[in-house]
Design a protein with these regions (language model features):
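Single conserved hydrophobic/aromatic residue that forms the stacking wall/gate
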Residues: 146-157
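N-terminal Rossmann NAD(P)H-binding glycine-rich loop of SDR-like oxidoreductase domains
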Residues: 5-25
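Structural motif
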Residues: 4, 63-64, 111
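NAD(P)H-binding glycine-rich loop region in Rossmannoid oxidoreductase-like domains
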Residues: 37-38, 43-106
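Conserved Rossmann-fold NAD(P)-dependent oxidoreductase catalytic core, especially the SDR/UDP-sugar
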Residues: 8, 13, 35, 79-130, ...
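Conserved beta-strand positions in the Rossmann-like core of class I SAM-dependent methyltransferases
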Residues: 30
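Glycine/Thr-rich phosphate-binding loops of Rossmann-like dinucleotide-binding domains
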Residues: 15, 39, 75-76, 122-123, ...
Length: 157
């Protein structure tokens, strides 16, 4: 049976891989992104300013959601995010993710795949890891079937 799968962040490296893998299935794919992507006409694309997530049409049917969005950070920012950049980071990596998960839940989703980070922990003193832990916990309370991936950055040789 075909599912309606919402992919958030398909323009990024990990989200692009999720899209590539799901294209081989017999499911209906819906992309939620900031800009239109070059892909097959059979893939439904919703272009939105993530500040306006609440304006999305909740009559959309969604069975699963994959969330692979996040603020672009330098390697040093994984250790320390400057005070003046923290608000933007929290907005993308917590608020946007929470809102798209709520949207998907309101559209019928019961399954979520979330890209997070190794070491995510609500009690961490590291802003990056604390926010990742906070959103993981928020998502766990929201949907019944949760898959959290905590990939690591691979060094290029």
């Amino acid at each position: 049976m075909s599912k309606n799968i919402l992919i958030v962040g398909a323009s990024g490296l990990v989200g692009g891989e999720i899209l590539k893998n799901l294209k081989t299935t017999n499911n209906d794919l819906i992309l939620l992104s900031r800009k239109k992507l070059l892909c097959e006409n059979s893939i439904n694309q919703i272009v939105i300013d993530f500040e306006n997530i609440d304006s999305l049409d909740a009559s959309l049917k969604v069975d699963e959601i994959y969330i692979a969005i996040g603020q672009k950070l330098s390697l040093s920012e994984l250790v320390y995010i400057k005070k003046n950049n923290r608000k933007s980071f929290v907005n993308v990596d917590y608020n946007y993710i929470k809102k798209v998960a709520e949207f998907a839940k309101n559209c019928g989703a019961n399954s979520v795949g979330l890209i997070s980070a190794i070491g995510a922990n609500t009690k961490s003193f590291n802003t990056y890891l604390k926010v990742k832990g906070d959103i993981e916990n928020e998502i766990k309370l929201m949907l019944s079937l949760i898959h959290i991936s905590e990939p690591t950055r691979q060094a290029e040789i």
